[in-house]
Amino acid sequence: MKNKLPPFIEIYRALIATPSISATEEALDQSNADLITLLADWFKNLGFNVEVQPVPGTRNKFNMLASTGQGAGGLLLAGHTDTVPFDDGRWTRDPFTLTEHDGKLYGLGTADMKGFFAFILDALRDVDVTKLKKPLYILATADEETSMAGARYFAETTALRPDCAIIGEPTSLQPVRAHKGHISNAIRIQGQSGHSSDPARGVNAIELMHDAIGHILQLRDSLKERYHYEAFTVPYPTLNLGHIHGGDASNRICACCELHMDIRPLPGMTLNELNGLLNDALAPVSERWPGRLTVDELHPPIPGYECPPNHQLVEVVEKLLGAKTEVVNYCTEAPFIQTLCPTLVLGPGSINQAHQPDEYLETRFIKPTRELITQVIHHFCWH
């Protein structure tokens, strides 16, 4: 059956040639069904059982779980099937044609992160899955680049509890064991419009927002003082005021003002805790002006993530790579997979190539990535 599997570079080429863009804008958003079908067929050829899971609340998106072996525990290798949209004017190559040049493989998703599945499939050619002592799972998720709906839904619904997981995001093969989360909110204040010549007849939303911002900045200072995680370059939760808009004319009392902000929490801080801190900070404004201030999510929140530094997964991977685990500031699906089992983020390619025109993966990653995948499968599924 394994001889039906195409060569490594042809698998890679087919993955890149199959569009699977995720976007909040419906006109740009694409189903990942064709890519899931490709992966499902290849893993079936390798003797895996394959389950395709529709993801609710998405535009025809799917997860795929390929599994082999019996019993509890085992290893989960995970990644997302979607890419970001691309700016055609900034690409000098066809994003959907895998192009090799000067030691680099170019194409949309080469690094972030369709290519990881090509590495898994290629490594499995030489693995007799019938002899595994523990199960091996391959998870391909949907919509990581927007809502992370695929990983969220899988984590909420699966009964699987592997011993550990590796998510193959581009980390330049440097293992990552922790990252911050991301919460984004819209603060909206509804005032009362009126002519600027008679301020008493209106409620100026900009003035109320000025008051609210003062309390939010106090929260920012408090977060910096109360929470600390030395391993991060910025070792405290950050709070950013990113966008504000209010009013429509200089001679009108502003009736509405909206502020967009984000918080990047440290691992261990819960979403409920952060929501409570924000609501407490804004309580004086809400109490003084009942019904005029609302807080809404801009995007589904992502908690911080941490794999215990003394876990066997960390020790094994650090020994195999000869490198210590790191912490990073960007977000992945790890917080959701971590609810199932200890998880590391580790994969070929550089995060600096993610979301960039002329995205590429350096060919120097091919051999060590294949070896690493083979080694972790041997360690966690054969021992």
From Swiss-Prot:
It catalyses: N(2)-acetyl-L-ornithine + H2O = L-ornithine + acetate. Its main location: cytoplasm. InterPro entries: AcOrn-deacetyl, ArgE/DapE_CS, Bact_exopeptidase_dim_dom, Peptidase_M20, Peptidase_M20_dimer, Peptidase_M20A. CDD domains: M20_ArgE (cd03894). The active site is at D82, E144. Pathway: Amino-acid biosynthesis; L-arginine biosynthesis; L-ornithine from N(2)-acetyl-L-ornithine (linear): step 1/1. It is found in: Cytoplasm. This is Acetylornithine deacetylase. HAMAP family: ArgE. GO terms for biological process: L-arginine biosynthetic process. Catalyzes the hydrolysis of the amide bond of N(2)-acetylated L-amino acids. Cleaves the acetyl group from N-acetyl-L-ornithine to form L-ornithine, an intermediate in L-arginine biosynthesis pathway, and a branchpoint in the synthesis of polyamines. Homodimer. Keywords: Amino-acid biosynthesis, Arginine biosynthesis, Cobalt, Cytoplasm, Hydrolase, Metal-binding, Zinc. GO terms for cellular component: cytoplasm. Belongs to the peptidase M20A family. ArgE subfamily. Its EC number is 3.5.1.16. Zn(2+) 1 binds at H80, D112, E169. Its cofactor is Zn(2+); Co(2+); glutathione. It comes from the Bacteria. Zn(2+) 2 binds at D112, E145, H355.
